[in-house]
């Protein structure tokens, strides 16, 4: 028989045991779980970005928890592991997409027990993984939240290099005060998400998915905004309750948009937009009739 308190306690304890054994590189990288004392009306399962950790969803997760919802942000496979990682000794990140897919499926099974409606979301490559789930299991998910999803990069030459080079890449912003993850990664570990992004765009043309909120920024130098729009337009045909928001260049919101330490000085815009979307039944047509400023100003 299902017992909510026992289940949530087990989720927390199992994650702690697993991460203690890694060992964890920084306490910020640990899985984040925010559980109400009883099953919640809404449950949010979030996937963090590439080489990063659950800390990216702390601000949004805390806002949703305060609104009365359950939040799960599990540490992804091969992430957050302590070690002296570099080009000669790269972090042990998966190079088989099935590792991430199985991970996502296991967590969706756990999360859907904890409330009435399940929302799945992700940032960057975590958004790619969430989009895959939205296409694979739309019947289990109420809505999907994609923040700067990595469907491909801004530069086609870089995409081509990602496809062919087996090298190690070090992040240019590795010294960012909001970064507690790896400073670099082996290119093949990113390639699998590039391939998945291409498949998601192709499948979106004829595969039903959940309603989606897709969030972009004109200052994002890592992802392709045109492909965010392409995905939105494809999903909108079947799911009229999908929304799209692209933050203006004047706001200088970078790809790392999920927290202020990572560079988003207008984080309230993202949080308020997300809360408005998950609590609304408005269609995109209705939003457009109200005026684009209804989203832009989160009124």
Residue ranges and their predicted role:
Residues 1-39:
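N-terminal cap/lid segment of alpha/beta-hydrolase-fold proteins
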Residues 25-79:
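Short, surface-exposed "cap/lid" segments of acyl-processing enzymes
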Residues 37-38, 185-254, 263-298:
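Serine-hydrolase catalytic core
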Residues 83-114:
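Catalytic nucleophile-loop/oxyanion-hole region of alpha/beta-hydrolase
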Residues 121-126, 130:
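Gly/Ala-rich beta-loop-alpha elbow adjacent to hydrolase catalytic centers
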Residues 145-156:
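Active-site nucleophile loop of the alpha/beta-hydrolase fold
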Residues 157-179:
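A catalytic-pocket lid/entrance helix-loop region that shapes and gates access to the active site
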């Amino acid at each position: 028989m299902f017992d909510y308190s026992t289940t949530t306690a087990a989720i927390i304890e199992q994650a702690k045991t697993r991460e203690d054994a890694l060992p964890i590189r920084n306490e910020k990288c640990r899985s984040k779980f925010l559980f109400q004392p009883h099953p919640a009306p809404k449950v949010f399962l979030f996937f963090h970005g590439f080489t990063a950790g659950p800390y990216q969803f702390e601000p949004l997760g805390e806002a949703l928890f305060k609104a009365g919802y359950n939040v799960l942000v599990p540490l992804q496979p091969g992430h957050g592991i302590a070690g002296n990682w570099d080009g000669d000794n790269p972090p042990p990140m998966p190079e088989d997409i099935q590792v991430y897919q199985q991970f996502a499926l296991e967590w969706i099974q756990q999360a859907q027990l904890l409330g009435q409606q399940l929302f799945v979301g992700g940032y960057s490559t975590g958004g790619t993984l969430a989009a895959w789930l939205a296409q694979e299991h739309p019947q289990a998910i109420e809505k999907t939240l994609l923040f700067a999803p990595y469907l491909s990069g801004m530069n086609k030459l870089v995409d081509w290099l990602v496809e062919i080079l087996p090298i190690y890449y070090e992040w240019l912003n590795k010294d960012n005060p909001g970064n507690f993850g790896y400073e670099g990664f082996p290119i093949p570990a990113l390639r699998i998400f590039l391939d998945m992004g291409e498949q998601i765009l192709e499948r979106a043309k004829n595969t039903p998915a959940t309603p989606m909120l897709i969030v972009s920024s004109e200052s994002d130098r890592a992802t392709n905004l045109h492909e965010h729009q392409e995905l939105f337009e494809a999903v909108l045909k079947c799911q009229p309750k999908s929304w799209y928001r692209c933050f203006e260049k004047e706001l200088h919101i970078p790809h790392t948009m999920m927290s202020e330490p990572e560079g988003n000085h207008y984080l309230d815009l993202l949080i308020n937009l997300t809360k408005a979307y998950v609590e609304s039944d408005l269609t995109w047509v209705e939003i457009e009739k109200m005026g684009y400023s209804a989203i832009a100003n989160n009124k």
